[in-house]
C-alpha cells in the first residue's frame, strides 16, 4: 500500500510506472486492512482479501516478495515458517505454504545445514496444522516423489527432468518454483553458478512435449538464488559474473540493482521504525 500510495518515495524518477506496477497489490492490501478499494468499487473487503493479486490461483508472489524471511530466524525453522505464512497475506491456497517452507529452509541453510538435512526437516514441518483428515499439507505431501525421482540427476539432465515433470503446472505455480529451488540446491549447492543455470533453463512445453518458450525463468532463478545464498553465502558467485549481471541491468533496463537494493533496505528500516 505504501508503494502504491507514495510511488515517488520508491522510484522518484518513475512515479507513474511505480504506481502502475504496485497496483496489482492495491486491492488485496485494502481488503486485508478491511477497507474498500478505489479500483474495485462495490467489492467487499473480505472478497478483496481472498482474491490474491487479482489471480484466482496460487502464484509465486510470496516467494518473490519475501525471499529474505528465513534469514531473520536462523536456526528456527518453525518461527521462520509461521512468520512468512503470516506475512504472505496476499497468497492463497498452498502458495502460503510454499512461501513458508522456503523461509524455513533458509533458516536452516544459513546456519550451515546441508541440503539433504534441510529437505528432511521441512518435509516434517507443519507448525500451523495445515494438514487435516486427508493427509499432509499439499506441498510437503507432493515433494517426496520429485525428490526420489531426481536424486541422481544433475546439470542438463536435471534441467530436462524439471521441465518435463513440472510441465503440467502453471509457469507461475509456487509448487513448481519450490521444487526447482530445492532440487537444484540439493544437486549443486557446491556450485551455485551452475545451480542458477539449471534453474533458468526451464521450458514451458506444449501438449506434444516440445518446448514452446522459456517458463518464468527469471523468477525461478530469484527464488532458487535466495535459497542458494543461504547455503553458500553472498560471496560464492564468481565476481566477474556478478559484475556482468549488474552492468547488463544498467545498460538494458537502466536499473542499478545495488542502489535499488539499498533503497529497499532503507525503506524497510524506515517503515519498521515508524
What residue ranges belong to the model's regions?
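Structured, active/binding-site neighborhoods that engage oxygen-rich ligands
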Residues: 1-274
Amino acid at each position: 500500500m505504501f508503494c502504491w500510495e507514495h510511488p515517488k518515495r520508491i522510484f522518484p524518477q518513475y512515479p507513474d510506472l511505480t504506481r502502475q506496477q504496485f497496483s496489482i497489490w492495491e486491492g488485496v492490501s485494502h481488503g486485508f486492512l478491511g477497507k474498500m478499494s478505489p479500483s474495485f468499487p462495490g467489492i467487499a473487503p473480505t472478497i478483496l482479501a481472498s482474491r490474491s493479486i487479482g489471480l484466482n490461483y496460487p502464484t509465486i508472489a510470496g516467494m518473490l516478495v519475501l525471499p529474505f524471511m528465513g534469514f531473520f530466524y536462523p536456526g528456527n525453522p518453525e518461527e521462520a515458517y509461521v512468520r512468512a505464512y503470516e506475512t504472505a497475506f496476499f497468497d492463497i491456497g498452498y502458495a502460503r505454504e510454499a512461501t513458508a517452507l522456503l523461509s524455513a529452509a533458509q533458516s536452516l541453510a544459513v546456519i550451515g545445514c546441508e541440503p539433504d538435512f534441510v529437505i528432511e526437516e521441512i518435509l516434517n514441518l507443519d507448525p500451523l496444522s495445515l494438514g487435516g483428515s486427508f493427509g499432509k499439507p499439499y506441498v510437503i505431501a507432493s515433494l517426496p516423489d520429485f525428490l526420489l525421482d531426481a536424486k541422481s540427476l544433475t546439470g542438463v539432465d536435471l534441467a530436462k527432468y524439471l521441465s518435463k515433470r513440472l510441465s503440467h503446472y502453471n509457469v507461475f505455480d509456487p509448487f513448481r518454483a519450490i521444487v526447482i529451488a530445492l532440487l537444484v540446491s540439493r544437486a549443486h549447492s557446491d556450485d551455485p553458478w551452475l545451480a542458477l543455470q539449471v534453474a533458468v533453463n526451464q521450458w514451458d512445453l506444449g501438449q506434444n512435449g516440445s518446448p514452446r518458450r522459456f517458463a518464468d525463468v527469471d523468477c525461478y532463478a530469484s527464488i532458487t538464488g535466495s535459497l542458494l545464498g543461504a547455503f553458500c553465502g553472498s560471496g560464492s558467485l564468481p565476481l566477474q559474473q556478478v559484475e556482468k549481471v549488474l552492468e547488463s541491468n544498467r545498460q538494458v533496463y537502466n536499473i542499478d540493482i545495488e542502489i535499488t537494493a539499498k533503497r529497499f533496505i532503507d525503506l524497510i528500516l524506515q517503515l519498521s521504525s515508524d
